[in-house]
A protein has these predicted regions:
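Glycan-recognition and catalytic cores of secretory/periplasmic carbohydrate-active enzymes
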Residues: 19-394
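C-terminal motif of bacterial Sec signal peptides marking the signal peptidase cleavage site
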Residues: 12-15
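Eukaryotic, compositionally biased intrinsically disordered regions
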Residues: 8-10
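Bacterial N-terminal signal peptides that target proteins for export
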Residues: 1-5
């Protein structure tokens, strides 16, 4: 249900017009995407992911069978909170509101560390903490989900919790010498030594700081938050983005030295449109102009290098070798980025690219038997044994 992004695609298409009025392609895509979200994606989660206790299952198989004893992740549950909150804010369906409120209560009661601050990484179905490590990634999704719940419902507890997590991340998650946010910590916020690729800072963690702070600023017009949001946006443009390659670097040490040269097409296009959204929310014209130029640049590069002849965005390139499978989230981010590029430029080629990817999704990634989407496709064939609900799959 991380397909909440599809809701954003639909919103973009609904709220934007070409120079000659709404196109047939716009109307068709918007209708098809909203229908898929409401008739296939959300019902799967409503029917199969809701546990009889106060929470949500940590793993659900393709056919809707829950793994009842599976651990439950903080990121998954923050995404569930965002998803039903956003669904209610978009469609005003009381069934979505009920699950948004349920997920808000469960998340606050189960995943917020009342002693040390922050968000637990993993609990068991009874709510006992299995992994109390603190990850910037989980913190940002918690802020994101709680802020969306506030926007959807006006629930002040959600805003208070989101603001509290923001302060915790600023106080304990920032790296003091070179600034930015460290990837992960112990339960009591001591910096760890063992990181993937030896990277204490990652593009992905900062991407979701940018995303979360953008949404929080829509709820809470705080000067300190504004400064940190602008810092994150400029950090992406000035330090994380490699203009010579037209891609974002992914892994860094504390001093912001890039450690691995690889390109993640999904993260690239996601960063482009999120930068535009941040600049728009900040109402900073100079930043907006920079973000728009960068978004077009990186979207163009990814479409040239990563869009396969079958119509999907490939996964990544490392050491000159492109990994050619289609991931669920990469396709959605590509559609969003193409619609964003179309909005910026007015060039219908970008809208056509979005439709090309959507056509691939309809043909290869939507599960017509059980609902929802497959997680991955290889050579145009879906991988059918991957759970539809898991720690990383929402």
């Amino acid at each position: 249900m991380f397909y909440w992004i599809a809701l954003l695609v639909a919103s973009c298409l609904a709220g934007c017009r070409s120079h000659s009025g709404e196109t047939d392609m716009q109307t068709r895509m918007r209708t098809e995407i909203v229908t898929n979200v409401r008739d296939s994606v959300l019902p799967f989660w409503m029917d199969y992911a809701v546990a009889p206790d106060s929470g949500f299952y940590g793993t659900v198989l393709r056919n809707g069978t829950p793994v009842v004893d599976a651990p439950r992740g903080g990121v998954l549950n923050a995404r569930i909170l965002w998803s039903f909150s956003a669904a209610y804010r978009t469609f005003k369906d009381e069934a979505y509101l009920k699950l948004a409120d349920k997920s808000q209560r469960y998340f606050i009661d189960t995943f917020i560390d009342k002693e040390h601050g922050g968000v637990y990484w993993l609990v068991n179905p009874d709510g006992e903490v299995l992994n109390a490590s603190k990850y910037t990634y989980a913190m940002t999704y918690a802020i994101y989900g709680l802020a969306e719940h506030y926007l959807a419902t006006g629930n002040s507890e959600s805003l208070d919790m989101a603001v509290g997590l923001y302060h915790t991340l600023e106080e304990k998650g920032r790296e003091p010498q070179y600034d930015g946010y460290v990837e992960s910590f112990t339960e009591d916020w001591k910096q760890l030594d063992n990181y993937d690729n030896n990277a204490s800072k990652t593009m992905n963690a900062h991407l979701h700081v940018l995303e979360a702070y953008t949404l929080l600023y829509q709820c809470w017009k705080d000067d300190g938050l504004r400064k940190r949001l602008k810092f994150c946006a400029e950090l992406f443009m000035d330090r994380i983005y490699d203009s010579s390659r037209r891609h974002f670097n992914l892994f860094f040490d504390n001093a912001w030295n890039s450690l691995v040269e690889m390109d993640s097409y999904g993260h690239d296009v996601e960063a482009g449109w999120l930068l535009c959204e941040a600049a728009r929310v900040l109402e900073d014209r100079q930043l907006m102009d920079r973000a728009n130029r960068l978004a077009l640049d990186v979207t163009d590069a990814c479409l040239v290098e990563g869009l396969s002849d079958k119509g999907y965005m490939m996964y990544e390139k490392k050491g000159g070798r492109t990994t050619g499978h289609a991931s669920w989230w990469g396709q959605i981010e590509t559609m969003i980025a193409c619609v964003n590029a179309w909005q910026i430029s007015g060039n219908d080629v970008y809208l056509q690219s979005a439709d090309t990817v959507w056509t691939f999704v309809k043909d290869c990634m939507i599960d017509r038997e059980y609902g929802e989407w497959y997680s991955d496709c290889f050579d145009g064939e879906p991988k059918k044994d991957t759970p539809k609900v898991s720690m990383w799959r929402c």
